[in-house]
């Protein structure tokens, strides 16, 4: 059974594998926009140069996830494809974003959110799972050795993303990847 973008429903949890933003942090260093020390660069550069596609995790999600896709253009943009195809809205808790210690140490929180949400090149999976499959999800991805994090939930409403920190709304102006820039 194929994993589609169009199956997310209100009440589903939103999850991602791995950590987000490291590849974008490495690229921003290489482009001269940020300065990383040698250890920081050594930690994040492989995420840009040699990403590990989550093939086994994707296979394990069949029959559990209501929707899924890989994160190549950034979480906000790619999750937007699920929301549009499914006709639903998302709420993302910024405190739940899986950020590596290197990313958290290298930049302020808002910059880390920008890199994680709009940086791209993560090649992790974003997926939605109905409540009744949460227990099976733990087992399936543990068997693959893949770390995953619940970052929010699907809501009824027009496609779009509401960001919160705890319960407080947060307004973000994300600058996503532009293939034609």
Segments from the language model and where they lie:
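Glycine-/charge-enriched secondary-structure boundary and capping motifs
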Residues: 63, 68-181
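Phosphate-handling active-site elements
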Residues: 1-7, 37-38, 87-90
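A generic local secondary-structure boundary/capping motif
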Residues: 1-7, 17, 49, 58, ...
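Short, compositionally biased
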Residues: 25-42, 62
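Polyanion-binding loop/helix "lid" in catalytic or ligand-binding cores
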Residues: 39-81
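Short loop segments at secondary-structure junctions
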Residues: 19-20, 33-35, 130-132
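Glycine-rich anion-binding loops of enzyme active sites
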Residues: 1-29, 153
């Amino acid at each position: 059974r194929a994993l589609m973008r169009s199956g997310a429903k209100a009440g589903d949890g939103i999850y991602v594998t791995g950590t987000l933003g490291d590849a974008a942090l490495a690229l921003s260093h290489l482009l001269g926009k940020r300065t990383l020390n040698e250890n920081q660069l050594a930690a994040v550069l492989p995420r840009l140069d040699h990403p590990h596609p989550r093939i086994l995790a994707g296979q394990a999600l069949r029959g559990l996830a209501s929707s899924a896709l890989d994160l190549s253009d950034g979480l906000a943009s790619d999750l937007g494809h699920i929301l549009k195809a499914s006709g639903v809205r998302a709420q993302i808790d910024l405190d739940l974003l899986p950020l590596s210690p290197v990313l958290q140490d290298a930049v302020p929180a808002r910059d880390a959110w920008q890199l994680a949400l709009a940086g791209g090149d993560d090649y992790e999976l974003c997926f939605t799972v109905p409540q009744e499959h949460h227990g099976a999800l733990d087992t399936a991805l543990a068997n693959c050795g893949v770390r995953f994090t619940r970052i929010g939930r699907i809501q009824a409403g027009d496609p779009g993303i509401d960001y919160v920190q705890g319960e407080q709304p947060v307004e973000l102006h994300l600058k996503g990847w532009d293939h034609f820039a």
